[in-house]
Amino acid sequence: MTDQAAATSADRRELISFRVGEQEYCVDIMAVREIRGWSPATTLPQSPGYMRGVINLRGAVLPIMDLACRLGMPVIEPTVRSVFIVVKAGDRTVGLLVDAVSDILSINDDMIQPTPDVACDAVRSFVRGIISIEGRMISEISLDRILPEREAMAA
């Protein structure tokens, strides 16, 4: 393998893409622990509006975040196609409620374009960049920014 080919393959990352409403988003696949079908969450009083509640995942309490609500999109009730993607960023593990998982993408970092200024500040702060691939525009979510701090999850 040439040095250039080795560098190119080393720069590649895999992302998992999913739908929230009519939009497509993705996260780094290395942060994904599992994907589970939707099951109702137990709501917690005084929790932020984007937190659906908690579920029991093999004996551990897992907070479930409604990604549509967190992104400022209209909230719709989950359907049979809805899933939650269990992700881990740092010491935080959360289930992200999404409408459906779409695809596994393999990209180079130079394929990521900056979020345009037309997006609202909340979305721009949560989105790492935009990936144009196979005729689709996919926003990469920054888990470090979108996941609430532990205090906010417990509030």
UniProtKB/Swiss-Prot annotation:
Location of the protein in the cell: Cytoplasm
Superkingdom field: Bacteria
GO cellular component: cytosol
Source organism of this protein record: Caulobacter vibrioides (strain ATCC 19089 / CIP 103742 / CB 15) (Caulobacter crescentus)
Keywords: Chemotaxis, Cytoplasm, Nucleotide-binding
GO biological process: chemotaxis; signal transduction
Location of the CheW-like domain: 12-152
Annotated GO MF terms: nucleotide binding
SUPFAM superfamilies: CheW-like
Biological function: Involved in the transmission of sensory signals from the chemoreceptors to the flagellar motors.
Stored Pfam families: CheW
Protein name per its UniProtKB record: Chemotaxis protein CheW
Classification via PANTHER family: CHEMOTAXIS PROTEIN CHEW (PTHR22617:SF23), CHEMOTAXIS SENSOR HISTIDINE KINASE-RELATED (PTHR22617)
